[in-house]
Amino acid sequence: MKNELRKTVLAQLTSQDPETKAKIDQYLLEQLIALPAYKDAQVIATYLSFPHEYDTSLLINQALKDGKRLLIPKTYKQGRMIFVDYDPGNIVATSFGLMEPASDLAVDKSEIDLIHVPGVVFNDEGYRIGYGAGYYDRFLSDFEGETVSTVYPCQKHDFQPDSYDIPVKEVVTCK
């Protein structure tokens, strides 16, 4: 069920009209930065997006302009993930095609105020289907800060989460 839903939604995401997607991305940014969770955050973690995902460069640029400390994830084998300070001059491509920091200097998760969480499919309770590796579910299992995801309409579906799934606290979307 999850794999089929993931495949269906990924196909829809990759076939989005670029002009429409850009407008939605800007709208989602405006909704996100209006949230108290964003306004109150000093340290924000996000990710470096693939072309079919929400364009995180918009959030990155806005957060830096707003004087926020910005973190991005680095993944390791066995599902381990850390967040490190964003340094655009220190980014490398992984074997999976992800853009990640070269640095291994992890920021303690207790320092992170808000995590902008990626995903492929989301339900009304904030549960998500990611890409299947479980990095975020493991990281978020004992994270006490705020979490938010930016979601296109085609990503909203009903599904039953697994017991180990961790919901995001806020889902920002458009009609």
Predicted regions and their residues:
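N-terminal active-site beta-alpha-beta segment that forms phosphate/nucleotide-binding
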Residues: 1-110
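Surface-exposed, charge/polar-rich loops and edge strands
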Residues: 4, 11-15, 110-114, 124-127, ...
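Redox-cofactor binding/interface segments in oxidoreductases and associated redox assembly factors
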Residues: 46, 117, 173
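Charged helix-capping and loop-helix junction motifs
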Residues: 61, 130-135
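Short glycine/serine/threonine-biased micro-segments
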Residues: 95, 124, 128-132
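Active-site and channel-lining beta-strand-loop segments
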Residues: 119-122
